[in-house]
C-alpha cells in the first residue's frame, strides 16, 4: 500500500476517474445554492441532485468530485469516537444514465488494488451486498474477490423518500486482530457490530429504481436511466493509508492538534483521553470553511450550528487551560492543510479570523452571565434546603450559555450539591428528537421526467431581438410528446427563441406566439429550462399549433426592459456593497422582477442608515455617469483572468457571458441587461432586513417605481408639514424638535405631580406602622399605574425614619407587583421577597436593601400582606 498525503489521496482519486472519462466537478459551497431542502451540503451527491432527478442533463454523464460536507446531527459524539466529524470530504464517482454495476465494481477494485493507484492488499478488503443483488455478488467474484470476503446484509438498500433508489455494495478495510480484542472476526460485519477493525471506506449505490413510498419495494419501477452514486470518506481513506489509529492522527488534523499543544502547553497522547484536542481540531475546520462560504454564527439555522460548534470548542479549550480567545489563531493552519484544493480559507483568512474572534469574545461574556445564573440556582436551592440541581436547569445552562455538564457539576460539587444527570439526558434527548423531526431532509432526488429527458432537439436563445420567426420543434401536453395541440395548456420548444427562461434570479419573459397571418395562437405565461437545456415555453393555447411549423415569437418588450433595468441595477448594488461594506458582502440570492429587485448578501450585522445612504448614492452616481454595459462570451478561465466575479457555489459551463459596467463592475451572468446605465434612471432602496443568521436582504426599485417611491415619501412629508403647520417641508425637523421639547416639559411636570401625589399618599401609608419582634414595618396595598411609582414610594420612605421595613403591593393590570425595602442588615429585602412571592404565584429577588417581585394571583394580595409579620 502506497504512503500518500491527504492531498495526494484526493488528487489520485480525481485523476483515476478522469482516466475513465469522468469530468471533475469542483467542490461547491457548504451553503446550498437554490436548494431550500438542505441546511448544509451534506454529501458528495447533494450538489448533483439536478442531474439525478433529470432536471438537467449534464454535458458529461460521468462525473467525479471531492466535495466538502457538513453533518451535525451527532455533535456530542465528535471527539469521543475515532471517526465522527462535523465537516468531512466525500470522494465520489457518478454515472448519470451511462455505465452501471459492472464498470462501477470493476473500476472500484482497480483503483483500490492496482499498484498504479492505491495498491491496497486485496486480502484486506471485504464487501457487503444486498442479498437479492446476485449481480453484484457475481461481479465481485469476477474481478477477483474471494467469496469468503463477500457478506450479505439486508440493510444494503439505499432509499430516502421518493426518487432514485437501489441496492448498494460497501467496501471495508480489515485493520487486523489488533483492533478486534475479543476476536469476533467477520461477525462484526455480518451483524453490523460497531468496531474499529473493519473500516467502511466506500459505498457504491446502484440507483436503478424509482422509489415510491406508496408501494412495496418489489413493485418499484425501473428508472428510465440507471445511475451510479458512490461515496468514499477522504478522512477514513487517509487514516487507512497512513496507518493512523484514528482519523485524527492523520495529516488532515495533526497540524491543528500540534498548534493546540503550543497554545495549551498540554501534549496530545494517542492512547490517552484526547477528546478536547479532537473536538477543537474538528470544529475549527467546520467553522473556517462554513464562515468562508458565507455562513455566520447566530441563533437559528446554520448560524445556531456554528455558534454551538464554536462554544463547544471554546469550552474544550478551557479544559486544556486556554482561558482566552484562541480558535481564530488556528484558521491559518486549517487553510494551509487544505490549500492545494481549497484556497478559499487562506484567501478569506482575515474575515474568518475576525468573525471567530468576535464570537469567542461574545461567548466569554455569555459564559460570565451563565456563571451568575448557575450561582443563583445554587443559592435558591440552599435556601430551600435542597441539594440537587434539576435536569432542566442543567440543560438550560448547556443550551443557552454553552455550559458543559461537567462545569455545572463542578459548581454543584463546590456547593456540596449534585446534578440530576438523568433529567439532563432526558431534556437533551427531547431536544435532539425535536431537531431531527424538524430537520429538512435532503436525500430524496425526486422523480425523473422521462418525457422531457428524451427531448434532445436543439434550441437557441437569441439575446439580441424581441421578436423572431422560428420552427416549433417539440410539443408536450399531458406529459407526453404530441404532434399538435389545439387548446388548454402546453409546453413548447422552438429551434430559436427570443424568450428568456427563468434563470440566475431573473424572471422569465411573457409574450405571444403568432402564426404566419399575424393571428395570436398562444400566450406565453412561463419559460423554464428543460433537462437538456432548451427553453420550455408554457403557453395557453388559443388556436391550433402544429409541429415543424413556423411561428413568430414576440416577447412583452416593455416588461423585459423593466426587468433588465433591475438586473443591471443588481450588479451595481453588488459592487457598491463590496466597496462600502467589504468584499465579504457577496451575493447569497437575488430576484430581478418587473417592479422591484431583491438582493440577499452575507453580512454579520444590520446595515446602518449611513451605509445604506452611501450605497444608494454610489449606485445612482454610476447610473448618472451613463456607463456602457457590455457583454462578451469567453471561456471561464479567461473570464476569471479578466477579474469577473463568479458567485461561489454556482456552476458554470465552458463558455460563459461576462457583463461589464464601465470599469465599475464585472460579473459572470447569463441574464439580460440594459445597454447603458442611464436607462435605469433612478435607484432607491426601500427596505433592508435580516433574513437569517449572517444574511441580509435589500429590496429596491428603479426607474418609474423609484420615482413613485420618492413621490410617496414627499407626499407623506407634505402631509406631516401641514399637520405641524410648517410652511415648508424642510422646516419639519425643527417643528418636531419643538414638539419633543414640549413633550419633555409635560413629562417632567407629570412626574412632579406624581411625586407630590405619592408623597401625599405616602403620608397616610407611612403612618400605619406595626411592630413584631422588635422590627418596625409597614405593609400596605397601594393604587399606582406602574411599578416605577412603587420605587417613588420607597424613595420617599427612605428620607425619614418611618420604619425598618417597607412592603408595598399593587395590582397593575392583571398582574401583582411587590416591593420590599429594608434599612437594617438583619432584614434582607431580597430574601424576604422570595419568600412572599409564591403566595401570589410569582417570583422575585433583589438586593438586601431593595427587591421586587411579580405575580399573577391578585386574590392573594391580602394574604401576602398578612404573611409579612410571620417572616420577621
Swiss-Prot record:
Keywords: Aminoacyl-tRNA synthetase, ATP-binding, Cytoplasm, Ligase, Metal-binding, Nucleotide-binding, Protein biosynthesis, RNA-binding, tRNA-binding, Zinc. Pfam families: DHHA1, tRNA-synt_2c, tRNA_SAD. InterPro entries: aa-tRNA-synth_II/BPL/LPL, Ala-tRNA-lgiase_IIc, Ala-tRNA-ligase_IIc_anticod-bd, Ala-tRNA-synth_IIc_core, Ala-tRNA-synth_IIc_N, Ala-tRNA_ligase, Ala_tRNA_ligase_euk/bac, DHHA1_dom. One of its GO terms (cellular component) is cytosol. Gene3D superfamilies: 2.40.30.130, 3.10.310.40, 3.30.54.20, 6.10.250.550, Bira Bifunctional Protein, Domain 2, Threonyl-trna Synthetase, Chain A, domain 2. It is an enzyme of class 6 (ligase). Transmembrane segments: none annotated. Zn(2+) binds at residues 567, 571, 669, 673. Binds 1 zinc ion per subunit. Catalyzes the attachment of alanine to tRNA(Ala) in a two-step reaction: alanine is first activated by ATP to form Ala-AMP and then transferred to the acceptor end of tRNA(Ala). Also edits incorrectly charged Ser-tRNA(Ala) and Gly-tRNA(Ala) via its editing domain. This is Alanine--tRNA ligase. The gene is alaS.
Amino acid at each position: 500500500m502506497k504512503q500518500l498525503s491527504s492531498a495526494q489521496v484526493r488528487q489520485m482519486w480525481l485523476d483515476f476517474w478522469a482516466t475513465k472519462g469522468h469530468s471533475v466537478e469542483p467542490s461547491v459551497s457548504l451553503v446550498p445554492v437554490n436548494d431550500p431542502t438542505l441546511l448544509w451540503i451534506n454529501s458528495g451527491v447533494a450538489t448533483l441532485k439536478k442531474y439525478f432527478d433529470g432536471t438537467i442533463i449534464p454535458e458529461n454523464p460521468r462525473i467525479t468530485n471531492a466535495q466538502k460536507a457538513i453533518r451535525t446531527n451527532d455533535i456530542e459524539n465528535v471527539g469521543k469516537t475515532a471517526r465522527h466529524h462535523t465537516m468531512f470530504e466525500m470522494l465520489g464517482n457518478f454515472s448519470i444514465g451511462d455505465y452501471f454495476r459492472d464498470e462501477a465494481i470493476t473500476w472500484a477494485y482497480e483503483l483500490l488494488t492496482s499498484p498504479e493507484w492505491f495498491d491496497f492488499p486485496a486480502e484486506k478488503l471485504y464487501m457487503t451486498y444486498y442479498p437479492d443483488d446476485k449481480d453484484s455478488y457475481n461481479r465481485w467474484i469476477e474481478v477477483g474477490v474471494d467469496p469468503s470476503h463477500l457478506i450479505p446484509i439486508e440493510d444494503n438498500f439505499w432509499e430516502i423518500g421518493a426518487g432514485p433508489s437501489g441496492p448498494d455494495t460497501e467496501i471495508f478495510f480489515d485493520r487486523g486482530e489488533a483492533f478486534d480484542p475479543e476476536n469476533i472476526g467477520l461477525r462484526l460485519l455480518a451483524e453490523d457490530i460497531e468496531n474499529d477493525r473493519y473500516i467502511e471506506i466506500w459505498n457504491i449505490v446502484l440507483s436503478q429504481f424509482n422509489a415510491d413510498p406508496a408501494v412495496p419495494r418489489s413493485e418499484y419501477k425501473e428508472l428510465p436511466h440507471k445511475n451510479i452514486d458512490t461515496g468514499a470518506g477522504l478522512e477514513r481513506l487517509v487514516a487507512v493509508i497512513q496507518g493512523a489509529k484514528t482519523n485524527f492522527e492523520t495529516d488532515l488534523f495533526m497540524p491543528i492538534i500540534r498548534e493546540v499543544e503550543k497554545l495549551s502547553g498540554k501534549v496530545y497522547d494517542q492512547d490517552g483521553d484526547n477528546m478536547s484536542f479532537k473536538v477543537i481540531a474538528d470544529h475549527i475546520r467546520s467553522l473556517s470553511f462554513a464562515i468562508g462560504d458565507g455562513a455566520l454564527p447566530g441563533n437559528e439555522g446554520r448560524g445556531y450550528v456554528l455558534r454551538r460548534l464554536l462554544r463547544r470548542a471554546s469550552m474544550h479549550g478551557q479544559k486544556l487551560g486556554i482561558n482566552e480567545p484562541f480558535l481564530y489563531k488556528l484558521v491559518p493552519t486549517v487553510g494551509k492543510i487544505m490549500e492545494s484544493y481549497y484556497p478559499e480559507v487562506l484567501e478569506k483568512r482575515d474575515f474568518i479570523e475576525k468573525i471567530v474572534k468576535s464570537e469567542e469574545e461574545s461567548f466569554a461574556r455569555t459564559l460570565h452571565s451563565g456563571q451568575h445564573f448557575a450561582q443563583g440556582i445554587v443559592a435558591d436551592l440552599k435556601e430551600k434546603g435542597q441539594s440537587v440541581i434539576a435536569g432542566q436547569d442543567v440543560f438550560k445552562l448547556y443550551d443557552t450559555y454553552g455550559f458543559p455538564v461537567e462545569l455545572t457539576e463542578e459548581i454543584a460539587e463546590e456547593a456540596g450539591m449534585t446534578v440530576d444527570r438523568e433529567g439532563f439526558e432526558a431534556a437533551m434527548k427531547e431536544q435532539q428528537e425535536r431537531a431531527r423531526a424538524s430537520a429538512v431532509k435532503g436525500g430524496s432526488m425526486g422523480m425523473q421526467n422521462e418525457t422531457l429527458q428524451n427531448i434532445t432537439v436543439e434550441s437557441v436563445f437569441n439575446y439580441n431581438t424581441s421578436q423572431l420567426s422560428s420552427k416549433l420543434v417539440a410539443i408536450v401536453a399531458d406529459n407526453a410528446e404530441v404532434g399538435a395541440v389545439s387548446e388548454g395548456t402546453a409546453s413548447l420548444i422552438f429551434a430559436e427563441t427570443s424568450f428568456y427562461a427563468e434563470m440566475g434570479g431573473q424572471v422569465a419573459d411573457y409574450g405571444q406566439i403568432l402564426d404566419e397571418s399575424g393571428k395570436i395562437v398562444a400566450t406565453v405565461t412561463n419559460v423554464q429550462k428543460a433537462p437538456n437545456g432548451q427553453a420550455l415555453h408554457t403557453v395557453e393555447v388559443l388556436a391550433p399549433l402544429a409541429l415543424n411549423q413556423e411561428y413568430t415569437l414576440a416577447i412583452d418588450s416593455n416588461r423585459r426592459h423593466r426587468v433588465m433595468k433591475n438586473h443591471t441595477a443588481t450588479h451595481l448594488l453588488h459592487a457598491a456593497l463590496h466597496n462600502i461594506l467589504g468584499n465579504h458582502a457577496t451575493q447569497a440570492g437575488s430576484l430581478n422582477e418587473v417592479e422591484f429587485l431583491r438582493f440577499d448578501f452575507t453580512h454579520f450585522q444590520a446595515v446602518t442608515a449611513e451605509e445604506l445612504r452611501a450605497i444608494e448614492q454610489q449606485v445612482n452616481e454610476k447610473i448618472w455617469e451613463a456607463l456602457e454595459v457590455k457583454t462578451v462570451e469567453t471561456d471561464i478561465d479567461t473570464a476569471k483572468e479578466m477579474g469577473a466575479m463568479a458567485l461561489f457555489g454556482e456552476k458554470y459551463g465552458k463558455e460563459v457571458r461576462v457583463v461589464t459596467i464601465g470599469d465599475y463592475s464585472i460579473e459572470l451572468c447569463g441574464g439580460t441587461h440594459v445597454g447603458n446605465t442611464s436607462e435605469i434612471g433612478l435607484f432607491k432602496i426601500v427596505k433592508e432586513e435580516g433574513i437569517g443568521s449572517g444574511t441580509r436582504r435589500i429590496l429596491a426599485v428603479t426607474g418609474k417605481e423609484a420615482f413613485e417611491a420618492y413621490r410617496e415619501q414627499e407626499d407623506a412629508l407634505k402631509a406631516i408639514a401641514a399637520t405641524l403647520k410648517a410652511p415648508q417641508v424642510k422646516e419639519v425637523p425643527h417643528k418636531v424638535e419643538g414638539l419633543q421639547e414640549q413633550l419633555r416639559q409635560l413629562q417632567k411636570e407629570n412626574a412632579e405631580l406624581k411625586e407630590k401625589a405619592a408623597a401625599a399618599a405616602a403620608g397616610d401609608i407611612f403612618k400605619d406602622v406595626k411592630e413584631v419582634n422588635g422590627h418596625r414595618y409597614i405593609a400596605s396595598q397601594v393604587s399606582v399605574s406602574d411599578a416605577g411609582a412603587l420605587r417613588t414610594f420607597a424613595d420617599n420612605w427612605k428620607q425619614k425614619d418611618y420604619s425598618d421595613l417597607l412592603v408595598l403591593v399593587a395590582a397593575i393590570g392583571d398582574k401583582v407587583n411587590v416591593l420590599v425595602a429594608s434599612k437594617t442588615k438583619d432584614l434582607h429585602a431580597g430574601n424576604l421577597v422570595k419568600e412572599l412571592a409564591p403566595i401570589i404565584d410569582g417570583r422575585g429577588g433583589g438586593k438586601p436593601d431593595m427587591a421586587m417581585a411579580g405575580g399573577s394571583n391578585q386574590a392573594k394580595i391580602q394574604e401576602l400582606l398578612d404573611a409579612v409579620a410571620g417572616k420577621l
